[in-house]
Amino acid sequence: MNKLGIFVNFWEKSWTINYPYYIDKVARLGYDILEFQAQPLLEIDDAKLRAIKKHADDAGIKLSYSLGLNPKYDVANPDDAIRAGGVEYLQNIVRKIAVMEGELFSGVTYAGWGVPSYFVDAAEKERLFARSVDSMQKVMTVAEREGVTVCCEAVNRFESPLVNTAAEAIRYADAVNSKCIGIHLDTYHMNIEENSIGDAIRLVGSRLRHFHTGENNRNVPGRGHLDWDEIFSALAEIGYKRDIVSEPFLQMGDEVGYDIRVWRDILENPTEERLDAEAAFLLDFTKGYLKKYGM
């Protein structure tokens, strides 16, 4: 069975978290993986990172790393200095993940998270693409040395103009042309951008390195209108054996609610107890589909 995880900001409304607390929580709930934003790792010394990794190992929890790249480190930016700073920033994150013996780093890694402040037409999108690929190839020199796969996540049009679909993710990975570039798909984003989620999964096929689940409105899978039979049957068809991490965002407020654009509590009265109950429902829901499709 695929290892199953949950994104820590299901509970936490800050990107900076109490790692041991949430490691223990997801272990008690029965998950295999805790995923969180990677950028706070840059502020933690290596000894403490190794202690966090040991705590996770002792709890039987795998750690997974994600990122929405701050625009001030935009590796696709027209400004040479911004791109160079972004390359160094991503390389340093890869090094920190390697300290924790991490294998994979995903998310909006290829450009600043969000829509650029300047106009993007078809010609500018090609220039964005070329600049990003050149930058990512420099990141790959460190990723290959450290043995960390960096995934490009196809996200919706409101979060990036560069990689919105599975086909665009494939084109990007082909251009970077490294053993350490991967493709990351997310059902929330695919629901917005793809004509068929199942076809998008099949198009990526064996190149799919990371997979996020979330409902049409950022809710817990099973609480919205996505066709989970279509999704899991496609994953089974391509023989997907890698991690599946759920990434619901249910709470408004603070930096996470603002950055994700959650303008209401999607779960009414989201106390920690209610969130824990939803996390338990989510785990059972996902395991049910894995069993149904022999995964």
Predicted regions span which residues?
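Structural preference for beta-strand elements that scaffold enzyme active sites
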Residues: 3-5, 33-35, 60-65, 102-106, ...
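Catalytic-core regions built around general acid/base machinery
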Residues: 47-60, 135-143, 200, 230-234
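Active-site-proximal loop/turn and secondary-structure-junction residues that shape catalytic pockets
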Residues: 10-12, 38-40, 69-71, 111-113, ...
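Histidine-acidic metal/acid-base catalytic patches
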Residues: 1-12, 16-29, 163-182, 191-295
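Active-site acidic/histidine proton-transfer and metal-coordination neighborhood
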Residues: 57-58, 80-182, 269, 273-276, ...
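N-terminal pre-domain/capping segments
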Residues: 1-103, 126, 178, 264-295
